[in-house]
Structure formats: C-alpha cells, structure tokens
Amino acid sequence: MTNIRKTHPLMKIINDAFIDLPSPSNISSWWNFGSLLGLCLIMQILTGLFLAMHYTPDTSTAFSSVAHICRDVNYGWFIRYLHANGASMFFICLYAHIGRGLYYGSYMFQETWNIGVLLLLTVMATAFVGYVLPWGQMSFWGATVITNLLSAIPYIGTTLVEWIWGGFSVDKATLTRFFAFHFILPFMITALAAVHLLFLHETGSNNPTGIPSNMDMIPFHPYYTIKDILGALLLILTLLALTLFTPDLLGDPDNYTPANPLSTPAHIKPEWYFLFAYAILRSIPNKLGGVLALLLSILILIFIPMLQTSKQRSMMFRPFSQLLFWTLVADLLTLTWIGGQPVEHPYIIVGQLASILYFLLILVLMPTVSLIENKLLKW
C-alpha cells in the first residue's frame, strides 16, 4: 500500500514542500531565516487576532483600548508586547534573510527574488499602518509625516494625501482604514509567501558555494526540520527575553502619550527597522528628491540581479566583494543610528555621506570589484 502522505492531494503538497523536498546537503544556518519568517508571520497573525478582539479603531477610544488590553485582559500585556516585539524579530529575520540572499547570490532566482522584494514592501506597509493603531503621539505624528511625503508627487500629490487620510488631516477615517489595512495585509503576505515558496521549489535552494547541488541532495525531513526547530527555539527564546525583561526597549516613550494634533514631539522618528530609509529620506534637502531616494533605497533590490557582473554566483570565494558587502552592512547600521538622531551637525553630513556610500556600493563599487575579481581568476 502506498503511503497516504504521497497519494492524498493535500498531503502530497505538504510532503513535496516540507518532507521529501530534495535539499542541498551543505546549507548553513543562514538558510534558517525563511522558516523563522514563517514562524514570525504565524505568531503575528495569532497575537494580532487576539488583540483585534479587544481593540477599538476609533480616535476617542483607541489609546484607552490598548491600555485596557494591558491592564484588564488576561495576559493582554503579554499578547500586546509579543506582537510589538514580534514585529522587531520579524524585521531582524527579514534583513538577515535578504543579506543572505545578497551574499550567496540567491537573487539569481529572479522570480523568487522579485516576489521577495514585493513581500518586503508589503511587510513594511503592514508595520507602518500597525504602528499608527495605538494612537499615541508617535503613532499620530509618524502617520502625518510619512503620508505627507506623497504630497511631493507633482500635480496629484495633495489630492492623493487627502484621499488616503479620508479628510484634511490624520483623523478617525485614517485610523479606521489603517486598522482595516493592518488586518488584511498579513493574509496577503501569507499568500505571497506561498507563491515565494512555489517559485523557490521550481529551482530548488541555492547553497553557500553557489555551485549547482543536484548531485548531492538530502531530504528536508529530518535533516532540516530538526535544524529549523533549533532556529525556532532560539528565536522564541530571544523574543521571550525581550518581551518579559525589556518590553519597551525598542519602542518610543512618546507613544505612551495619547495623540495630540496640537503638540508636536521634539523628534519624530519611525520604529528602528525603518530608520535607515528615514535617514536616506532626510539626507536630501529637496522633498521630492528625498521621497525618490527613500523609494529607491528599497526598490534597488529589484536591480541587484541585473548588476551581477561576477562569474561566480556566491561571495564565498570572493574576498574583495566580501569586504564591500560588510561595508554595506556597516553603512546600513550607520544609517540606522543617524535616523534616530536629531537633524543637526555632525549628524546631517554623516547621514549624507552614508546615503551616498549606500548607493555607490550597490550601483558602482560591487559590480566593478566583481569585474576585477573575474580578471584575477585568470592569473
């Protein structure tokens, strides 16, 4: 008798994706982040669902409904902080996942990569609208500042902003629609993740060497299921430590003050995971130029496969490219730091230099160094 796992239409899909999937025998822990992102998504949807049961998307009651969740709902504080810090863990895994893709040349699977960029944009949109929901000072002013960026679009900008707001300022209509977006987007992310996986399984996984591994494959289960479980345990441990010991470490104290349109906070800044893009936005004195740079800082990922000039896929055997890659990581950390600082000397010039270096590294230096490495191969 044939195993039901291999014959049943539904079980067969699960089997081919998570059990009998042929996987390269040498993939490292950097390949764990895909499954960790799946885990983060499930956790965020579940905690978010329980929060939505008690939250009210109305300007007069939103802030107090969050306070009510934390004070009166059984383990409400725990669910709320799991959700808030879960978002941070989500972005840590996301950036590590993208970094792995850049380092090992996974972007050469173009369909998978492009769906991944789309996923990144959707997750960023979800996190942004979610940050507005507690209706604290930073929620309100963050929403005002970021949505206002669209007014830089010539001719239709102002109309577009008022259309998104549902009025002439960020108000009740804005909060209600942002809650609706925040509820629906994670399900779109889930669907996109399934498509991401579908395209990945068309080609099979890449591996650290960047060399085809068709001749040396092992089944996903038990080898990589056990490895993913270890990663999951470490992720949960980190998340629990963050949530139970320092739940407000990554948050903004201003968000414990109810939203007040008449009082602007001294320093308006987004959550830490958007600071690098915020720093790039602020480093350009022109509004439209800043918005374009902000967009390009993320959308540049789409062009990465076209900028591949190396004969080798992975950076594993390319020391000069490795140096530039880690310079890029350091540059992004610098931008993240600058994004959280006030707009004054010396932060302005450091931010501008880091922004220039970011685009220079990706568009000019990395492709050029790859060509030089190709020449060195002939020596």
From Swiss-Prot:
GO BP, sorted A to Z: mitochondrial electron transport, ubiquinol to cytochrome c
Cited function: Component of the ubiquinol-cytochrome c reductase complex (complex III or cytochrome b-c1 complex) that is part of the mitochondrial respiratory chain. The b-c1 complex mediates electron transfer from ubiquinol to cytochrome c. Contributes to the generation of a proton gradient across the mitochondrial membrane that is then used for ATP synthesis.
GO cellular component: mitochondrial inner membrane; respiratory chain complex III
Annotated Pfam families: Cytochrom_B_C (PF00032), Cytochrome_B (PF00033)
Leader sequence residues: none
Complex and partners: The cytochrome bc1 complex contains 11 subunits: 3 respiratory subunits (MT-CYB, CYC1 and UQCRFS1), 2 core proteins (UQCRC1 and UQCRC2) and 6 low-molecular weight proteins (UQCRH/QCR6, UQCRB/QCR7, UQCRQ/QCR8, UQCR10/QCR9, UQCR11/QCR10 and a cleavage product of UQCRFS1). This cytochrome bc1 complex then forms a dimer.
Disulfide bonds: none
Protein name: Cytochrome b
Cofactor requirement: heme b
Keywords: Electron transport, Heme, Iron, Membrane, Metal-binding, Mitochondrion, Mitochondrion inner membrane, Respiratory chain, Transmembrane, Transmembrane helix, Transport, Ubiquinone
Highest taxon of the lineage: Eukaryota
Main location: mitochondrion
Bilayer topology: Multi-pass membrane protein
Transmembrane segments: 33-53, 77-98, 113-133, 178-198, 226-246, 288-308, 320-340, 347-367
Residues given in the record as a ubiquinone binding sites: 201
Additional note from the record: Heme 1 (or BL or b562) is low-potential and absorbs at about 562 nm, and heme 2 (or BH or b566) is high-potential and absorbs at about 566 nm.
